[in-house]
Amino acid sequence: MATLTNLEPLATGTVILKTTRGDIQIELWCKEVPKACRNFIQLCLEGYYDGTIVHRVVPEFLIQGGDPTGTGMGGESIYGEPFAVETHPRLRFIRRGLVGMACTENEGNNSQFFITLGPTPEWNGKQTLFGRVVGDTIYNVVRISELELDANQRPVFPPKIISTEVIDNYFTDIKPRSTKEEREKIANELAHQEKQKERNKLLKSGRRNKAVLSFGDEVDMPIVKKPLRQKTPVSRSSDTTTELSKDLISSSSSIHSTYSSAQTGLTSAKVSSDEYARQVDTLDTKLNSSSKSKVQEEISRLKSELRDLEKSGGSSNSKPVVVRPKKRNILTEELEKYKKSKKVVLGKRKNLENDEESTLRALSSFQSKIRNAEDEDVMDSQYGSKIEDTPCSLHNVPGCFSCFDRLGEKNITETNSNWFAHRLVAENDPTRRTEELRIQRAEELKDVPSARPKKLLMKRDII
């Protein structure tokens, strides 16, 4: 790689592409490929690549971007038309990380560019090579090449170029045609003009576009008011009287007889419309009075119920008490089981005075046991021979081997309290033995002559 890099000319420009997958630092050969480098730097200064995506990825071959449409068919150069391919004998596609202009055979270079992922010698002399990716940013290019792709070599989630930054500009005479802010302003104005045209069309047609949301800055559409329909006069004939009579009979059973008599009177005599209207009004008043009486009865019933509740001790605002079941507590259940198993001793805490008395009582009993054991040991030492000469109580034989110790064994009559009178005497004291050995060794070494020369011994004595 070092030898390959040394063959390439020195870079004279630097640009950083800030993507969603990390930065990509590109060094440019502006002296060798001036037209392509000027085009690329000016597009970066104008913010032309901001928001564009990497629309094509071929693993182990290349990644391609720079198309504002995101389809691979768009893009334009700063010259207003595609420019020709530029080549140089020292610039060849022999490794990964090389940046070139994307173009077809019939068309020239526009704004699209690609970055190689391996050697592509078939492009030498056919594509414009104008830069290289440097530093650790090459790993961001490799990371982009490992994305998930669809059948058309397009990333499922394409990375986006957030912004571009020109670090070293070789062409000091470049003047951007427009800045990013100016282009955004123009785009907003065009969008506003299109909305205004649509609004004017809707105003002319007299319809409101209900599919479009209305905001505060938009002009309210005029609402066409439809004329109210005038009520046509109702001819109160005998047929309408029969229908009204049926409705009134179903609404109130109390005035059924009155309304039926009126109906028969109207049908037989064919009364005028004024008389019919007067009878209908009387029926309405009766209906209203009957409904009011029912409401009054309901109010009086509720008041009586409230009085009964107050007398019984309850209040009208009091809510029924809902008895909720207690939650199961596993800890209390286990404690109850443990208490029932009689493994726990329940009682009050003892006083300190009683504890001291019990401790002193236990100490005195222990001391008495030690004294009794010492007395028994003394008695055995004084009267042991006499006891052995007496006949045993089991066999009635004096000096019985079964009941007395004749072979240095312990008697069966020993109790657990005999160890209180026992004294431990060490047969061989290790400290005493060590001291004896040291003295013996010192006496043996007295007669051994010293290995040091006499001159050294004399010097030591003089000092």
UniProtKB/Swiss-Prot annotation:
Reaction it catalyzes: [protein]-peptidylproline (omega=180) = [protein]-peptidylproline (omega=0)
GO biological-process terms attached to the record: mRNA processing; protein folding; RNA splicing
Transmembrane residue ranges: none
Subcellular location: Cytoplasm; Nucleus
Gene Ontology CC entries for this record: catalytic step 2 spliceosome; cytoplasm; U2-type spliceosomal complex
Keyword Acetylation annotated: no
Enzyme class, first EC level, given as a word: isomerase
Keyword Heme: no
Region (Disordered): 224-275
Low complexity bias (residue ranges): 250-261
Polar residues biased stretches: 232-243, 262-271
Function according to Swiss-Prot or TrEMBL: PPIases accelerate the folding of proteins. Catalyzes the cis-trans isomerization of proline imidic peptide bonds in oligopeptides. Involved in pre-mRNA splicing.
Protein name: Peptidylprolyl isomerase cyp7
Encoding gene per record: cyp7
